[in-house]
């Protein structure tokens, strides 16, 4: 029996736990940062706050105790991007050598421009500390080789710490997947990416069921950036819908949106083909058109003239990752000298209060370009 810890008891974390339970043969620990929340879910055997209507089977153990993390062969992180670093730092002592760590959060850390697998590695001291403020000159988009081991005056290497010995595999799970539909058991296909294809194949097998199919990849960069950046384009699609624009506009935004996502992903080391798959075009189409998309919902409300603080408050504690991703994505694009006009206009709407209709007009009046 495999022991799997799911970090984050929101809608997506709960849906992943339910999907894993359908596979059978797993002991699943759904970890919450809040003892009160964990007790409520465990008592009701249902996540009444974030994903009501689904009974949690006996194979899912809901807890706020971090000890089960140390017992797990696989850790699936579904913690929202803005809380990921402090959460992993808090749980650092419970990670152990040989674990497989899967990030299922779609975002980019605002302060560092790091992808989610990089944030986890950084919080575990595998990467250098992140900077405290966004800066295109200090955004880190690649892993850095660790420093050479310290050597004492006697010439003997210093004894390794726990984290020096920590040998973890980091990967990403992404693709078109509304939590509600995954929880309902509707057929869903996702991509799981690890640099080591054998580890990706292992995760694929652990998740596989008649309702969930995983495809493997070694392109962690492309899979993560596709999942994160499409949220910004989904906000743009919502803005267009809220402003009363039609299908022509939506098609243009999605097509040009995947073009700018691909440019940045390739510049960061991703593969163009990845963005044509489930974690790129697939996720983009779903999030830009589906009524269950929180990012599209936020954009639609903005297009109707509502203010961002009011919109976010109406989400009932759920997170629209694109709101936080826009600025970090733009900083990363500036570092790599990549044009991302849609992302730029969304950042101005979200963070500078630009009128959505002015943003749409400015996109249309940009100088003529070749289609690439």
Identify the function of each model-found stretch.
Residues 1-54, 61-64, 90, 139, ...:
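NAD(P)+-binding Rossmann beta1-loop-alpha1 motif at the extreme N-terminus of oxidoreductases
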Residues 103, 169-174, 214-218, 276-277, ...:
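General beta-strand structural signal in soluble alpha/beta enzymes
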Residues 56, 62, 67-70, 74-77, ...:
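Rossmann-like NAD(P)(H) cofactor-binding subdomain of soluble oxidoreductases
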Residues 10, 14, 22, 31, ...:
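Electropositive phosphate-/nucleotide-binding environments in soluble metabolic enzymes
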Residues 230, 237-241, 266-276, 280, ...:
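NAD(P)-dependent Rossmann-like dehydrogenase/reductase catalytic/cofactor-binding core
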Residues 94, 119, 124-131, 160-169, ...:
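Internal alpha-helical scaffold of NAD(P)-dependent oxidoreductase catalytic cores
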């Amino acid at each position: 029996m495999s022991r799997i810890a799911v970090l984050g008891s929101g809608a997506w974390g709960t849906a992943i736990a339910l999907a894993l339970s359908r596979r059978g043969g797993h002991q699943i620990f759904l970890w919450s940062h809040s003892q009160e929340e964990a007790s409520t879910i465990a008592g009701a055997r249902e996540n009444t706050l974030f994903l009501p209507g689904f009974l949690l089977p006996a194979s899912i153990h809901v807890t706020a105790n971090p000890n089960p993390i140390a017992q797990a062969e696989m850790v699936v992180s579904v913690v929202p991007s803005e809380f990921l670093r402090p959460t992993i730092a808090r749980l650092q002592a419970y990670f152990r050598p040989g674990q497989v760590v899967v990030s299922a959060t779609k975002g980019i850390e605002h302060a560092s421009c790091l992808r989610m697998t990089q944030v986890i590695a950084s919080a575990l001291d595998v990467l250098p500390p992140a900077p405290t403020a966004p800066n295109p000159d200090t955004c880190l988009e690649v892993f850095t080789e660790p420093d050479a081991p310290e050597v004492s005056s006697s010439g003997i290497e210093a004894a390794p710490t726990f984290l020096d010995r920590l040998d973890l595999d980091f990967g990403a799970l992404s693709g078109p997947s509304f939590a509600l539909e995954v929880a309902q058991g509707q057929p869903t296909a996702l991509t799981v990416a690890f640099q080591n294809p054998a580890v990706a194949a292992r995760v694929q097998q652990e998740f596989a069921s008649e309702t969930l199919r995983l495809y493997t990849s070694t392109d962690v960069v492309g899979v993560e950036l596709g999942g994160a950046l499409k949220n910004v384009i989904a906000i743009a699609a919502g803005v267009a819908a809220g402003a009363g624009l039609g299908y022509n506009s939506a098609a243009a935004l999605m097509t040009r949106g995947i073009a700018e996502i691909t440019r940045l992903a390739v510049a960061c080391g991703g593969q163009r083909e990845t963005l044509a798959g489930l974690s790129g075009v697939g996720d983009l189409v779903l999030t830009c058109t589906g009524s269950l998309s929180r990012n599209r919902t936020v954009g639609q409300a903005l297009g109707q003239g509502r203010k961002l603080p009011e919109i976010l408050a109406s989400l009932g504690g759920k997170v629209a990752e694109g709101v936080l991703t826009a600025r970090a994505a733009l900083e990363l694009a500036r570092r790599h000298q990549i044009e991302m006009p849609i992302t730029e206009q969304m950042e101005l709407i979200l963070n500078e209060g630009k009128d959505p209709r002015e943003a749409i007009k400015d996109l249309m009046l940009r100088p003529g370009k070749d289609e690439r």
